[in-house]
A protein has these predicted regions:
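Catalytic cores of secreted/periplasmic lytic hydrolases that degrade extracellular macromolecules
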Residues: 1-156
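Amphipathic alpha-helical interface surfaces
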Residues: 87-90, 176, 187
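Repeat-associated, polar segments at repeat-unit boundaries in modular proteins
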Residues: 132, 137-142, 181-196
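Tandem-repeat/low-complexity and Cys-motif detector
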Residues: 151-153, 179-182
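Hydrophobic aliphatic residue packing
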Residues: 165-166, 191
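Extracytoplasmic Gram-positive cell-surface binding/anchoring modules and repeats
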Residues: 166-177
Length: 196
C-alpha cells in the first residue's frame, strides 16, 4: 500500500465512522482501483477517487478518456466524470449512489454495486475482492471474515443473477445487455452453463 493510498483510505475510514458506514473495505478497495492507488488526475485534481460519473450532484464536470466495456469488449471513449471541491463532496455522493450507510453485509453491498452498474468491467467485483484480500481491508470493518468467503459471495451473486436471467427477469437480447451492463458476459456465461 502506498503512502498516497494510506492517506486517502484514512480519510475515508474517518468519514465512514462519522456517517454510519459499517462495511468500509468495499469502498476502500474501490478507492484504490478507481484512483489508480491515489495517483489519477481525476482524484488529484478533481477530488473524485471513486471514478463517479457526472450527475447534477457533482460540483462540476471533468471529461476524460476512459476504457469502458460494451458486450464484453473494451472500448475507449470520452466520459464525463464528477468533479468535487473537496473529498467530502465525493464521499457524500458515493454514499448516496451506493447506499453504503444502509447496507450492512458484503453480499448485499456487492450485489447492489452490480445492480446499479457501478462499473462496466465484467470483472469489477472480482477486482474489488482481490484488493480486499491483498490488503486485508476487512480489518477496517470490525468483523472477522474469511477472505475465501468473499469469492463465494461473488459466485452467489453471479448465480442469483443468472437464475433471474433464466426466469426472464432481464428480458432478451439488447434489453438483457442493457440491464446487466458490463456484467452481461460473466452472467450470460453462467446462464449458458446452467442451461447445458
Amino acid at each position: 500500500m502506498t503512502n498516497e493510498d494510506k492517506m486517502i483510505l484514512d480519510e475515508y475510514v474517518d468519514y465512514c465512522n462519522r456517517n454510519n458506514i459499517n462495511i468500509k473495505s468495499i469502498g476502500m478497495a474501490q478507492l484504490m482501483i478507481e484512483s489508480s492507488h491515489a495517483t489519477s488526475e481525476l482524484y488529484t485534481k478533481h477530488h473524485n477517487p471513486f471514478g463517479i460519473k457526472y450527475t447534477e450532484n457533482a460540483d462540476y464536470k471533468a471529461t476524460y478518456k476512459t476504457t469502458e466495456f460494451c458486450d464484453g469488449k473494451e472500448i475507449e471513449c470520452n466520459a464525463d466524470f464528477a468533479g468535487y471541491y473537496d473529498l467530502n463532496g465525493c464521499f457524500d455522493d458515493y454514499k448516496r449512489i451506493t447506499h453504503a450507510d444502509t447496507i450492512h453485509d458484503f453480499a448485499t453491498y456487492l450485489d447492489y454495486l452490480n445492480e446499479i452498474g457501478y462499473a462496466t468491467n465484467p470483472a469489477y467485483i472480482r477486482l474489488i475482492l482481490d484488493v480486499i484480500n491483498d490488503y486485508n481491508l476487512t480489518e477496517y470493518d470490525g468483523v472477522t471474515i474469511n477472505n475465501d468467503s468473499l469469492f463465494d459471495e461473488l459466485d452467489e451473486i453471479i448465480e442469483k443473477l443468472a437464475r433471474k436471467v433464466i426466469n426472464g427477469d432481464f428480458g432478451n437480447g439488447d434489453d438483457r445487455k442493457r440491464a446487466l451492463g458490463g456484467y452481461y458476459t460473466i452472467i450470460q456465461d453462467r446462464v449458458n452453463e446452467l442451461l447445458k
